[in-house]
């Protein structure tokens, strides 16, 4: 290992010491040791006149990350240099500035590596070049720090050549694009797109024989004269340039021409140079796997005369449903297309209604178009020889953590693109057909934002210097991009966290429905919140990226010195961007904040007055409430006292009654009672005699009545006066008898008591 550059503090972050790590010194030495002709290529034509531009340089990506480690490909040593970004460092351990591991290839590749790609299972790394491909198997980890083979300085790694005989025998063929099959459950498979317009799928178990082959050329173009046929199709832009897999979906059995059931497969989107996109479905779940029929070209809406460009170079499928395709062109245009099911009225469906697969061809709806600033556009005269637009191939890269962000790398630098409208699109697609609010929110949503991270061609006379690679490191304070320049300088730039997903909730947290949510948080999450308003004001349409000082490690500063006029233009451009995109927007945000603060102060004063009034009302309310409660308590006590008083009175009556009952001398009332009782028998005898008299009179009258009613005797006819007299006499006698009976009953009851 190399010696340490300097001591490292315990509390320092990796962002501060990583650019000074010894691995970059080693890689820069490897660049200096290259052949002079190879090293002078990037420095050619650096004079101020700049008569011509060199051909496009290959865009490399020789960096990837795994966990807390950074892997850098050393082309000179055919090895990976592994740096731990968050490794433990205790006492007596060598400082991290000189500590790294070297993963050496046992069978090094014989071709130049342009890209390294980690497999979905994270056990293999694809070493991709234009003339071949190899798969490097990562060694095992063990030890307390979980390092490769316990932390050895150099570790041998086995490599698997992919399609070695094919590339050796076909010298005219080149590898255009390569990607891993996205399944983590199967054995690793890698997908290759070659210049003969054929996609081949290889398994690491049988790396020389393709498992599946997808021929993209038409039947009439497949002739014995392959070179002439390929040149003809390439001139028309009918060759595939890139592909990408989408998320796993369930595909109808008609696509695979099966009769039993539907198949679970990955959609494979294939981009042609003329801008057309084709679709097929790949399923390797069951051996030997299934390949769907090639569908397309997919119709694009709204239609464009130029089919959205004839210089397409890259395609990327964002991992969301519905799928969102990003199509890049060499002129710097990015098209964000939503993949939706085709309409029944589609012309293509009507023309191919005889084909059952035509019903399954989706459509691409171009949601927005974005133009990247590949090279800085400086204010210049009309007769500027560099007025023509700069163009170069663009590579699209997924963000390892954020599904709504992706990155673009090209010869002139690096861009980062974030899509803020994906969640609004999901809301709109998940809403009812009559729900227009979600559609209005989707149309009102701000477009994607573009960050110009790095510019390697700040001046027109500068030659492009494509980066060696980059990687996104997630952090608690936001994502950070690590860029490795062509001279192996390490640049660390933080990314905007606007589209960065929120941290998931902890397992120990439980939602409590009774706990009310903070009104400030509710206000901040509303679509019209002040925070989002300030963010919209501060949203920049342009930025000043990081500039590279030198484009080549072997070129002198005198050769690379730009003309003073272009330096002035560059400074003017940077000043204008700072003025318009930073200072002016910050002044506007400041005015809005001051206006908001004034309004909030007025609201605060009014709320304080209302608060004082509420406090007074609360005090009076509490006083009235206390009086009411006191009155209720007194009423309860009064009722209890009244009940106790009645109870005591009843007890006193009983006591007095028992007391009088035990006296030896009769009281006045008792004596009166005694006299009344003594008079009762006489009254009873008198009443008895009266009853006997009445009874005798009744019997007498009864006998008289019988005699009167007897038929032997003549009927006695009474006059009206006589009847009236008799009725009055009987009435008086009846009342007299009734009174006597009542008196007798009263006396009887009294005596019984």
From Swiss-Prot:
UniProt cross-references to InterPro entries, sorted A to Z: Nucleoporin_Nup88 (IPR019321), NUP88/NUP82 (IPR037700)
Subcellular location: Nucleus, Nuclear pore complex
Gene name tied to this protein: Nup88
One Pfam family here: Nup88
Highest taxon listed in the record's lineage: Eukaryota
Positions bearing Phosphoserine: 35, 380, 438, 518, 541, 710
Recorded GO MF terms: structural constituent of nuclear pore
Assigned GO CC terms: nuclear envelope; nuclear pore; nucleoplasm
Coiled-coil portions: 623-663
Keyword flag Magnesium: no
Primary location group: nucleus
Protein name: Nuclear pore complex protein Nup88
Keywords: Acetylation, Coiled coil, mRNA transport, Nuclear pore complex, Nucleus, Phosphoprotein, Protein transport, Translocation, Transport
Record-listed Phosphothreonine modification sites: 526
Statement: the UniProt record of this protein carries the keyword Nucleus: yes
Function of the protein: Component of nuclear pore complex.
N-acetylalanine: residues bearing it: 2
Subunit record text: Interacts with NUP214/CAN. Interacts with NUP62 and NUP98.
Taxonomic source organism: Mus musculus (Mouse)
Leader sequence residues: none
């Amino acid at each position: 290992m190399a010696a340490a550059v300097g001591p490292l503090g315990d509390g320092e972050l990796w962002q501060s010491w990583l650019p000074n790590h010894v691995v970059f010194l080693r890689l820069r030495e490897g660049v200096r040791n290259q052949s002079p002709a190879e090293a002078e290529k990037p420095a050619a034509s650096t004079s101020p006149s700049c008569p011509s531009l060199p051909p496009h340089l290959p865009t490399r990506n020789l960096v990837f990350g795994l966990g807390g480690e950074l892997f850098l490909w050393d082309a000179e040593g055919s090895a990976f240099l592994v740096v731990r970004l968050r490794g433990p460092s205790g006492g007596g351990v060598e400082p991290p500035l000189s500590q790294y591991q070297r993963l050496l290839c046992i069978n090094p590749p014989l071709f130049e590596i342009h890209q390294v790609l980690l497999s979905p299972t994270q056990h293999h790394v694809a070493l991709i070049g234009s003339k071949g491909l190899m798969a490097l198997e990562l060694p095992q980890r063990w030890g307390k720090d979980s390092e490769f083979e316990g932390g050895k300085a150099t570790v041998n790694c086995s490599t698997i050549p992919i399609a070695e005989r094919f590339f050796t025998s076909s010298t005219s063929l080149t590898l255009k694009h390569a990607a891993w099959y996205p399944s983590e459950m199967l054995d690793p498979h890698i997908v290759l797109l070659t210049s003969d317009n054929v996609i081949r799928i290889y398994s690491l178990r049988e790396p020389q024989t393709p498992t599946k082959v997808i021929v993209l050329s038409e039947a009439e173009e497949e002739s014995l004269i392959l070179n002439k046929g390929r040149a003809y199709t390439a001139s028309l832009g009918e060759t595939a340039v890139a592909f990408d897999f989408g998320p796993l979906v369930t595909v109808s059995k008609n696509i695979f021409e099966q009769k039993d059931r539907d198949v679970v497969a990955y959609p494979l989107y294939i981009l042609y140079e003329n801008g057309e996109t084709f679709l097929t479905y790949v399923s390797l779940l069951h051996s030997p796997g299934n390949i769907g029929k090639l569908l397309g070209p997919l119709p694009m809406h709204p239609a464009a005369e130029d089919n959205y460009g004839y210089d397409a170079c890259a395609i990327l499928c964002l991992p969301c449903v519905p799928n969102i395709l990003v199509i890049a062109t060499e002129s710097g245009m990015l098209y964000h297309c939503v993949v939706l099911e085709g309409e029944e009225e589609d012309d293509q469906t009507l023309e191919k209604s005889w084909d059952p697969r035509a019903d399954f061809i989706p459509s691409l709806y171009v949601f927005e178009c974005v133009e990247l600033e590949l090279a800085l556009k400086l204010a210049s005269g009309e007769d500027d020889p560099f007025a023509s637009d700069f163009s170069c191939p663009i590579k699209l890269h997924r963000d390892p953590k954020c599904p709504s962000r992706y990155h673009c790398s090209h010869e002139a630098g690096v861009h980062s693109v974030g899509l803020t409208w994906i969640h609004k699109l999901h809301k709109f697609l998940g809403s009812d057909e009559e729900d227009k609010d979600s559609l209005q929110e989707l149309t009102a949503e701000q477009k994607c934002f573009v960050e110009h991270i790095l510019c390697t061609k700040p001046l027109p006379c500068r030659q492009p210097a494509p980066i060696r690679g980059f990687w996104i490191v997630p952090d608690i304070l936001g994502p950070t991009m690590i860029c490795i320049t062509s001279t192996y300088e390490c640049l660390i730039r933080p990314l905007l966290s606007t589209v960065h997903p929120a941290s998931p909730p902890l397992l120990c947290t439980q939602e409590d429905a009774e706990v009310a949510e903070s009104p400030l948080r509710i206000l901040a999450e509303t679509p019209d919140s002040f925070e989002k308003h300030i963010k919209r004001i501060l949203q920049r349409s342009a930025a000043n990226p990081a500039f590279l000082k030198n484009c080549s490690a072997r070129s002198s500063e005198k050769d690379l010195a730009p003309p003073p006029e272009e330096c002035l233009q560059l400074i003017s451009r940077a000043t204008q961007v700072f003025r318009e995109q930073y200072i002016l927007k910050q002044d506007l945000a400041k005015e809005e904040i001051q206006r908001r603060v004034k309004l909030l102060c007025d609201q605060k004063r009014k709320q304080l007055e209302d608060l004082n009034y509420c406090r007074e009302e609360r005090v009076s309310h509490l006083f009235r409430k206390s009086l009411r409660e006191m009155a209720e308590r007194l009423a309860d006590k009064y009722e209890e006292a009244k009940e106790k008083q009645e109870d005591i009175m009843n007890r006193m009556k009983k006591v007095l009654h028992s007391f009088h009952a035990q006296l030896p001398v009769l009281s006045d009332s008792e004596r009166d009672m005694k006299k009344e009782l003594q008079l009762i028998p006489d009254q009873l005898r008198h009443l008895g005699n009266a009853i006997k008299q009445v009874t005798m009179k009744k019997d007498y009258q009864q006998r008289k009545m019988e005699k009167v009613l007897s038929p032997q005797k003549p009927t006695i006819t009474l006059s009206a006066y006589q009847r009236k007299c008799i009725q009055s006499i009987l009435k008086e006698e009846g009342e007299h008898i009734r009174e006597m009976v009542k008196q007798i009953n009263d006396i009887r009851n009294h005596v019984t008591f």
